[in-house]
């Protein structure tokens, strides 16, 4: 993790130590003989300047957002403060540390996650929209390689 992007060190994980995330996720994949194909999911949640007071609040949002998958999948996040707006990168091991099954990535799960995120956003007085950038619009997966979920506006 780059300290220039995370000066306040808001980095965390569930079922994995963030400093050793790559190695620990690889070990889970190997233990279940699932070390081929796509094994990681990456997405970003970004915030407008007026939506959250500071990086601490983005960290609180990120911790809550991770809990949706934390009982089944290793997940790590990092709050980036180096841009005009705060944003959080998430990386999830698609191989379950509980049973070795691969994350299915079905649309129902995506929409359940969006609903869950909206419940969190409600606590912060904002709401979630899905934003497609040029790269993710070419990908049919709800969590494209560059998929972005963005809270937008105060309620």
Label each region the model flagged.
Residues 1-155:
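N-terminal nicking endonuclease/strand-transfer module with a His-rich metal-binding environment
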């Amino acid at each position: 993790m780059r300290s220039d992007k995370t000066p306040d060190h808001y980095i965390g994980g569930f079922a994995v130590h963030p400093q050793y995330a790559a190695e620990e996720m690889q070990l889970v994949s190997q233990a279940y003989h699932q070390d081929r194909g796509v094994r990681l999911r990456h997405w970003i949640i970004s915030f407008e300047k007026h939506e959250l007071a500071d990086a601490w609040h983005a960290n609180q949002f990120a911790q809550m957002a991770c809990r949706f998958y934390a009982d089944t999948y290793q997940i790590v996040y990092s709050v980036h403060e180096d841009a005009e707006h705060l944003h959080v990168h998430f990386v999830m091991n698609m191989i379950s540390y509980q049973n070795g099954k691969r994350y299915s990535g079905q649309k129902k799960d995506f929409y359940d996650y969006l609903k869950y995120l909206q419940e969190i956003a409600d606590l912060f007085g904002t709401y979630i929209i899905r934003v497609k950038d040029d790269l993710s619009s070419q990908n049919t997966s709800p969590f494209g390689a560059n998929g972005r979920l963005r809270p937008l506006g105060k309620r």
